[in-house]
């Protein structure tokens, strides 16, 4: 049975949505055990008795707040995220899910659990909607602000493995995010990364921002600085469009009537762009499984983050990443 450690105290709204999301996951999936890490008394009051045999509680006195430095994480051994990560390091859990301090989670997972063989920098990967009824994968979206060409090469290989193992894409197309499709476009980093990525049979060359959403490419590679801006901009645009639509619909009764007739369409669209449908973003390149969830995660988002962790673990993707990197990494 898969064991998932959940940072019960992380997140903007305290333990309630985290624990409620864990219980939702347990209701729907009987094939995993949850280890909730945090203040024992607070957690116990939120757990129905019938789930006691499927939930273990590991007490943690401390919580790393969102406004604290990520460098604090390694010193705070009594914090909920530190203890949750340690459960993976010691083999007591196969994966960890946290909606807490993302920098602390990344640092602890990288330094305490450790990186996979031939991985120099783990990357955060996120799924993006496209209008071709499939998803695209973007990495890195925030783990590494400054990158070297070899890091982007590794991201391409890891993204390729993820698309094959998790997204079930037979021959994923890997693209490098740049300011133009031509090989001569980009900065020094992307030009040098392009040269390295050309050795991958799945590499299709440079892609532009619009290609993230048009379904023409499965894996989009970029540094964490660029990727995080892409992610936050996408979230902002989706939110702005939603609010603009609501404001314009309310202007006339006819529009409101038309909106009611399109309720199913709007519901389907919301599902495509709602972060809670994805649950979280995997930190690819570390041992075990680390899922980083949004601080504002709802119970539904936590439930889906746990499911994402289970899928990640069962896919044996880490073995596939190590094998693929061994095959394609230049020797010497």
Curated annotation (Swiss-Prot):
It is found in: Cytoplasm. InterPro entries: FA_synthesis, Phospholipid_synth_PlsX-like. GO terms for molecular function: phosphate:acyl-[acyl carrier protein] acyltransferase activity. The keyword Transferase applies. One of its GO terms (biological process) is fatty acid biosynthetic process. It comes from the Bacteria. Its main location: cytoplasm. Belongs to the PlsX family. NCBIfam families: plsX. Homodimer. Probably interacts with PlsY. Catalyzes the reversible formation of acyl-phosphate (acyl-PO(4)) from acyl-[acyl-carrier-protein] (acyl-ACP). This enzyme utilizes acyl-ACP as fatty acyl donor, but not acyl-CoA. HAMAP family: PlsX. This is Phosphate acyltransferase. It comes from Nitratiruptor sp. (strain SB155-2). The lineage of its organism: Bacteria, Pseudomonadati, Campylobacterota, Epsilonproteobacteria, Nautiliales.
